[in-house]
Amino acid sequence: MKIWIDADACPRVIKEIVFRASERLRIPVCLVANKNLAKHATHLVESIVVGEGFDVADDYIADHAAPEDLVITADIPLAARIVAIGGVALDPRGELYTEENVGERLSMRDLMMELREGGLVQGGPSQFSLTDRQRFASSLDRLLTRLIREMRPVS
């Protein structure tokens, strides 16, 4: 298992929560971004800088993530791609993308984009809050516990 982070837009506090979980559970993390990222003191965290361009980081993650991996992303099309291969995707606000909800989330995203382009809706998501951070930490903990349990061979 590996944790992939779509790092360009991921809040720093979320990355820090993931790094702590990585250290505690000895799970490797791979940050993928279009720009250079800060170096990390642990061998468990790898940073990959991809070329500039639309969806280049998303494409890299989708091409390299395995079904047993966890992807942290706010990008709904990337989450849909991960779920389609049987992978697990978690939003930085703690929402788990599933086969049951990712299609609806994608449709809602597309609708909101059209409404914004038409000037009918302004702004984007609400500012990242302490509640979002706590929800993410709780969701990540539950999810990693479940994924680790599912990976253990039954004896």
UniProtKB/Swiss-Prot annotation:
> What's the protein here called?
UPF0178 protein Gmet_1725
| TM stretches of this protein | none
- What Pfam families does this protein's entry cite? DUF188 (PF02639)
Which family is this sequence assigned to? Belongs to the UPF0178 family.
Species: Geobacter metallireducens (strain ATCC 53774 / DSM 7210 / GS-15)
- InterPro entries in the record: UPF0178 (IPR003791)
